[in-house]
C-alpha cells in the first residue's frame, strides 16, 4: 500500500477522532445530537487504541468512506485495510469545532480538522480539511456512519 494512499486513510480514519471539543458546543447539543457526537468520539477512541473492530463497528455494513478526494470506497475489506494501515502513523488530530444536525433517523456531523503524524520514514505529515459524515440511527437507537468524507474542503479549494 502506497504512502500516498495511507495519508488520506489516516485523515479519514481520524477525521472524527478527537477528544478536543469546545465545552459550549456540547452543552448546546440536545440529547440526540450528543448521542451522534458520542458515536464519533467512540470511533476516535477505538482508532487511537488500534481497535479495528471498534472502528469498523462505527459504520453500517454498506458504508462509504472517502480515503482520497473523489475516490469513495464501499468495500468493507478495503476500508478495513485502509484503517489498519492508518494505525501505523499514530496521527494526532485537532478540531476547531463540531456541528451536529439531526432530522429523524439521519444525522450530519461537520468538523474542521488538522492532523499531524509521521510517515514510516519519519517524515512529518501535516494536513487539514473539513470532515462531513452522515449517520443513521439503528433499530437499537445507536448511530452508525453511512458516509464518511474528511475532504469536504476540496470543493472550496477547486474553485
Task: Give the residues covered by each predicted segment.
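Bacterial N-terminal signal peptides
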Residues: 8-19
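N-terminal hydrophobic alpha-helix used for membrane targeting or insertion
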Residues: 7-8, 94
Amino acid at each position: 500500500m502506497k504512502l500516498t494512499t495511507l495519508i488520506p486513510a489516516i485523515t479519514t480514519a481520524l477525521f472524527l477522532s478527537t477528544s478536543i471539543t469546545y465545552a459550549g458546543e456540547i452543552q448546546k447539543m440536545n440529547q440526540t445530537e450528543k448521542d451522534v457526537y458520542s458515536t464519533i468520539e467512540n470511533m476516535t477512541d477505538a482508532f487511537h487504541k488500534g481497535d479495528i473492530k471498534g472502528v469498523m463497528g462505527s459504520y453500517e455494513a454498506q458504508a462509504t468512506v472517502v480515503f482520497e478526494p473523489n475516490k469513495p470506497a464501499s468495500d468493507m475489506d478495503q476500508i478495513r485495510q485502509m484503517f489498519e494501515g492508518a494505525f501505523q502513523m499514530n496521527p494526532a488530530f485537532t478540531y476547531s469545532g463540531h456541528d451536529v444536525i439531526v432530522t429523524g433517523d439521519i444525522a450530519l456531523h461537520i468538523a474542521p480538522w488538522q492532523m499531524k503524524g509521521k510517515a514510516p520514514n519519519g517524515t512529518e505529515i501535516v494536513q487539514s480539511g473539513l470532515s462531513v459524515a452522515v449517520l443513521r440511527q439503528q433499530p437499537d437507537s445507536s448511530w452508525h456512519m453511512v458516509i464518511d468524507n474528511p475532504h469536504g474542503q476540496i470543493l472550496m479549494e477547486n474553485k
